[in-house]
Curated annotation (Swiss-Prot):
BP-aspect Gene Ontology terms: protein homooligomerization
Lineage: Eukaryota, Metazoa, Chordata, Craniata, Vertebrata
Protein known as: Potassium voltage-gated channel subfamily V member 1
GO molecular function, one term: voltage-gated potassium channel activity
Assembly: Heteromultimer with KCNB1 and KCNB2. Interacts with KCNC4 and KCND1.
Gene name tied to this protein: Kcnv1
Membrane protein topology class: Multi-pass membrane protein
Family (UniProt): Belongs to the potassium channel family. V (TC 1.A.1.2) subfamily. Kv8.1/KCNV1 sub-subfamily.
PANTHER family: POTASSIUM VOLTAGE-GATED CHANNEL SUBFAMILY V MEMBER 1, VOLTAGE-GATED POTASSIUM CHANNEL
Transmembrane portions of the chain: 214-234, 242-262, 280-300, 313-334, 349-369, 410-430
Compositional bias ranges of the Basic and acidic residues kind: 171-187
Amino acid sequence: MDLSPRNRPLLDSSSLDSGSLTSLDSSVFCSEGEGEPLALGDCFTVNVGGSRFVLSQQALSCFPHTRLGKLAVVVASYRRLGALAAAPSPLELCDDANPVDNEYFFDRSSQAFRYVLHYYRTGRLHVMEQLCALSFLQEIQYWGIDELSIDSCCRDRYFRRKELSETLDFKKDTDDQESQHESEQDFSKGPCPTVRQKLWDILEKPGSSTAARIFGVISIIFVAVSIVNMALMSAELSWLNLQLLEILEYVCISWFTGEFVLRFLCVKDRCHFLRKVPNIIDLLAILPFYITLLVESLSGSHTTQELENVGRLVQVLRLLRALRMLKLGRHSTGLRSLGMTITQCYEEVGLLLLFLSVGISIFSTIEYFAEQSIPDTTFTSVPCAWWWATTSMTTVGYGDIRPDTTTGKIVAFMCILSGILVLALPIAIINDRFSACYFTLKLKEAAVRQREALKKLTKNIATDSYISVNLRDVYARSIMEMLRLKGRERASTRSSGGDDFWF
């Protein structure tokens, strides 16, 4: 909109609602009452988002590094020296200016500006509850106010919400997901585009069709069967048919291999496909089997020592088959949320390990010197006391090593109590982050389902085919699902004792 003086409409008290006027102390800020600029040499008018405020240059001079403080200096220079003087232009600090009426225009939020006004009046900046942390930060940065100026009553809540917003970064992550989704589904280039697209939908979108849902269920069954089969093969029970278990292992590996190969053949950017974490997990789930076969086939003509080394390698490779459990992350929002939480909370996890390490080192040393004089004591060394301190601080308490003296029992009590306190500090933060990640992923899944339904509706309209999707029902379902998720989110937030989730 053109805000030049000749095109700008005149603002008077009738064109402004009561919420647009500011009633502050006239010695600091003056509110416009009749719509005409006040004839005060120390005041000038700012128009922020359609709301007019009359400010005092004297009050703004206390904040010379802010935008309005600099504007007050420029306005004073213009009044003294005139427009032809070598003074900065007010347009460098505002969006438009009317020197005749001494009014300066800013295309910013008038609601957030009231908090800025309060800061100029009292020197204390409070956080706007209705605005997310990152948007509020953008507003105060525009006005030249540092976020460290936030008052102590709002500072902790603001920085926690800001950290959560930056970590989740909902909009950026959604945009990245959409761009990646579009790049992977460009099947126009390459052979059999229609077949590849349908196959990709079945493999990667379990809710897109009945065939995709059936395929997802079968994939979960194969993962569960392979894990149970691996456990039974290690049990060495007399009634088990090992040959049947080996055949079942071959069948499961064949399924996993075919699933991975089909995904690999469908995508266009195969290098990007191999760098994705779920595909790396799929590859690690099948590679140990083939490496084991290769090692066993090449170990036929080696010595006994070499065969022992090969046997150890084969055992290690077989242990890696437990990674198949991670394949369930493709079908479980909870597992993906757990992975996101561990990735994002590495600082809290490191802090937890640091606290435990310090406590274990201190209490194990004290307990060792308290118990070493007892005959047949189980605290034979400080490393043995490490194990006792670890099980005590984590409240596991195996009981294989226990104190016998009164002093040792007092130390054990202090060790257990400190372990409870130490574990409670970062785990609360990790729990909040997990809840936020889980609800964010659920909202993304709802958005993806809505986008797929709209694409299907658009395609049906373009081809004049039968429309089986109702636009009203699509939006109604998406809104109801988001409301349900937000309700669960608020309930989870109340149960954790905080209100620190902003989306």
